[in-house]
């Protein structure tokens, strides 16, 4: 999380810094973004930046935490809401995903995240997010335990792979929200009912 010096700044200055960082990560992936561009936009020194954030990644994660939603947490909430009915949760999940991904003010952030995410970033993000998450942790832990038990655990890894690839393709191929939902519903129907009909 940001350093204490950041939180000691006046609210107006904090917001200016966050907006500059957000703009940088809307316009560039994490591999192309730079502290240099951020401090030049703000008219501050590199030294000042490092009194607020440990590194560029921490500033990136701060924006992700503030501006985006963790999709697996959306799914876990739906799974819990539907009393463990996996198929119902998956049906609603597609609608929630499409609604969130295609918000105009968030689209660029999600695009740069899903096209340029790496295992190293994922590990750092998990550490950062667990320290700062704002969801009801007890509720989420109960839901997470349900889906991580036994055979469900491997199945959830499979669903995660399917969904992440759909999201990545949606950005690579510039899908609309409608096209994304069409692909999502088709692939989830394969999960539910198998491939027999399309192979015959």
Where do the language-model regions lie?
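Basic, helix-initiating cap at the start of DNA-binding domains
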Residues: 1-28, 37
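N-terminal secretory/targeting leader peptides
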Residues: 2, 26-31, 36-40, 62-65, ...
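Generic hydrophobic, amphipathic alpha-helix propensity
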Residues: 13-21, 38, 63-71, 75
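Short hydrophobic/aromatic patch on the recognition helix
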Residues: 43-53
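Short amphipathic alpha-helical segment with a characteristic S/N-K-E followed by hydrophobic residues
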Residues: 55-60
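Hydrophobic alpha-helical connector segments
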Residues: 62, 76-103
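Amphipathic alpha-helical packing segments from all-alpha helical-bundle domains
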Residues: 69, 117-165, 182
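C-terminal peripheral helix-coil segments that are non-catalytic and often amphipathic
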Residues: 165-200
